[in-house]
């Protein structure tokens, strides 16, 4: 299959990239996180975008690695902000090396992402715009944790920024490397944004109801953290008589929240089915 071929190419390049890193405290977390089992969706989209417009996957490998580096940089810092204990079933970088090293190593990954994406000025410009939008999306995500009145439309814009624009960027960069024109770039990027929305909604469901052994993440981690996911927003909108239960739990500290109770209520309200149907 196409994705399996892309994943094989990317995994081989990631292994070589990790093996070439200096053996020190700054680079060890990069090699650790990049070396964990991963789907490699974003770099695969770079290769796909390149081949769709007549280019060679091998010709876009630097850009694919750059996108994967940036994605893992965001994961490293997101895990710090979320106080997440696990990433892909393994201890997060800040749990293993400490917060300070995780921050610094993540910063260095961002620099390396820019280096990998430096061949084409147009790619550099597209990536810079995308990186800023991803940061804007992450800030909205954190802002929403402190608000009780987040609507579905606001949430969809947040996940467009946090997730959709990076998938769009990956496909657009691949098309640029292949020499695609502006209209084709715009079309493939629009597809990437919609794919990103679906990807994030599915991730919301897996975070809440997925098997930790399969997802590699703590079940209900977003609910425990009070994140305004689609599930929680729609649950608060639907829970007329039970709205107080969700609000009471959200008023507690994260460690004190009855997460199984909250997840049970959300499923009973039908928001899981609604998210999966979108």
Regions found by a protein language model. Name each.
Residues 1-278:
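All-alpha prenyltransferase/terpene-synthase fold signal
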């Amino acid at each position: 299959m196409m994705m399996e071929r892309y994943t094989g190419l990317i995994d081989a390049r990631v292994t070589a990239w990790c093996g070439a890193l200096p053996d020190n405290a700054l680079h060890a977390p990069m090699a650790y996180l990049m070396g964990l089992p991963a789907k490699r969706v974003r770099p695969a989209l770079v290769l796909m975008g390149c081949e769709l417009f007549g280019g060679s996957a091998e010709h876009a490998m630097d850009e694919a690695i750059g996108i994967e580096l940036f994605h893992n940089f965001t994961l490293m810092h997101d895990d710090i902000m979320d106080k997440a204990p696990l990433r892909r079933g393994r201890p997060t970088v800040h749990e293993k090396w400490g917060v300070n090293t995780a921050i610094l190593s993540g910063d260095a990954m961002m620099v390396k992402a820019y280096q990998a994406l430096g061949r084409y000025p147009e790619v550099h410009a597209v990536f810079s715009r995308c990186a800023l939008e991803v940061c804007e999306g992450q800030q909205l995500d954190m802002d929403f944790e402190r608000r009780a009145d987040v609507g579905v439309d606001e949430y969809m814009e947040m996940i467009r920024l946090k997730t959709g624009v990076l998938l769009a960027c990956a496909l657009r960069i691949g098309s640029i490397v292949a020499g695609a024109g502006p209209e084709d770039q715009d079309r493939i990027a629009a597809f990437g944004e919609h794919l990103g929305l679906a990807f994030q909604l599915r991730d919301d469901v897996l975070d809440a109801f997925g098997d930790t052994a399969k997802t590699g993440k703590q079940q209900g981690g977003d609910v425990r953290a009070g994140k305004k996911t689609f599930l929680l927003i729609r649950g608060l909108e639907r829970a007329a008589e039970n709205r107080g239960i969700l609000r009471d739990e959200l008023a507690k500290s994260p460690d004190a929240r009855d997460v199984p109770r909250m997840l049970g209520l959300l499923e009973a309200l039908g928001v899981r089915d609604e998210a999966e149907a979108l």
